Amino acid sequence: MEEFQGYLELYRSQQHDFLYPLIFREYIYALAHDRGLNRSVLLDNVGYDKKSSLLIIKRLISRMYQQNHFIISLNDSNQNKFFGYNKNLYSQMISEGFAVIVEIPFSLRLVSSLEETETVKSYNLRSIHSIFPFFEDKFPHLNYASDVLIPYPIHLEILVQTLRYCVKDPSSLHLLRLFLHEYYNWNTLITPKKSIFAKSNQRLFLLLYNSYVCEYESILLFLRNQSNHLRLTSSGILFERIRFYEKIKYPVEEIFANDFPATLWFFKDPFIQYVRYQGKSILASKDTPLLMNKWKYYLVHFWQCHFYVWSQPGRIHINQLSKHSFDFLGYLSSIRPNISVVRSQLLENSFLMDNAMKKLDTLFPIIPMIGSLAKVKFCNTSGHPISKSSWADSSDSDIIDRFVRIGGNLSHYYSGSSKKKSLYRIKYILRLSCVKTLARKHKSTVRTFLKRLGPKLLDEFFTEEEQIFSLLFPRTSSTLKRFYRGRIWYLDILCINDLVNHE
């Protein structure tokens, strides 16, 4: 009955947007702890042990309200703000619990939007690889792409203000301000170099940052959709000249703020495409470089005027797709012409026709990847494999499993590469590094160790897909060769794991 009463209280809070009472409910923190365990890839959970107490959390929240935040002295660093308790544990508990509560309005909006549009829930659309089929379909018809780095807000108040449109509970927002202020002071006194985006509180700040990006993209999408409804008029020729003289007299932001129809006309482009992953986005268009420069300077002024975030135009790079490649999601992508010769027969005359088509080319970044392998001591900066000395104390099966897992993840993620030769080189580095690590552990040479184990050791590095293809088709068949050369996009990749995570 108590569990039913708790969920009933949760439902009533959702209906009236009263999120503040949920902060003092223990099942919220238990739910946050369970989510932390299920999302161990993103978070390193510090534990919901027996020493944790909801009473201590209430005392901490009360103390945040009682403190005078206008008086901050250096002597505060010597004071124990948590009465002798583990402040890292309880700061993470409060942040994770608050993140679960604030996610409630976003979840309700998502469910209602799916029900209204009758959208089929497809988890395949969450895959990172689902972006590249979109590139293959749209980008060959475009000419220019802007590489945009979304700036981070300098002041935390900007992040709180972006939540006002979804979270309509003033008490919750006020408590969030106090917590951010308090936690920001802890981090500046304890770990000043790591800033506020610490690993232990990643969930809350990811939520705040995503709300900030969502606000930015909603305005950008509104301008994009509204500009498509504008029609050509006879005064369109005079628009550029009028805007030129107004820019001389007034700042650009005043023009955008006072003349909204002109702003929409300013960005009339039916071929604009926008893609984002985390803090990096691609803005591509079929139009001229002039329009891309308009978007570039508008984004800079938009961030400065609306979010009070300073951004330099140099953070936005405009490249021609046919001449330059852009780095996105670990791939070097570019548009290259694919010329095919077609023989045509017309009565007694025959002639050849060159059919030129543009194709998306996705390359494996061999040089950055060698740098990453050298950073974690799999090879040197020249790409020569070396032994992993820190793993030499592990068992043979554990060492082999670690190397096989890293090689399998790289093969799985970079299966969409147009040219697999660079990927095979990386796998060769991992194989030889594994052999050298095992030889170092057994105090033997590489040649002697390979003779003792035979080729079975290297067979461990074949991925599951390669083993299935080798069973279905003979290794000499042309079908298997096409599979090796062709691009394969997987719809089960939800995040990019860094090599350091395998330490």
From Swiss-Prot:
Keywords: Chloroplast, mRNA processing, Plastid, RNA-binding, tRNA processing. GO terms for cellular component: chloroplast. It is found in: Plastid, Chloroplast. Its main location: plastid. GO terms for molecular function: RNA binding. Pfam families: Intron_maturas2 (PF01348), MatK_N (PF01824). InterPro entries: Domain_X, Maturase_MatK, Maturase_MatK_N. GO terms for biological process: mRNA processing; RNA splicing; tRNA processing. Belongs to the intron maturase 2 family. MatK subfamily. Usually encoded in the trnK tRNA gene intron. Probably assists in splicing its own and other chloroplast group II introns. HAMAP family: MatK. This is Maturase K. It comes from Rosa multiflora (Multiflora rose).
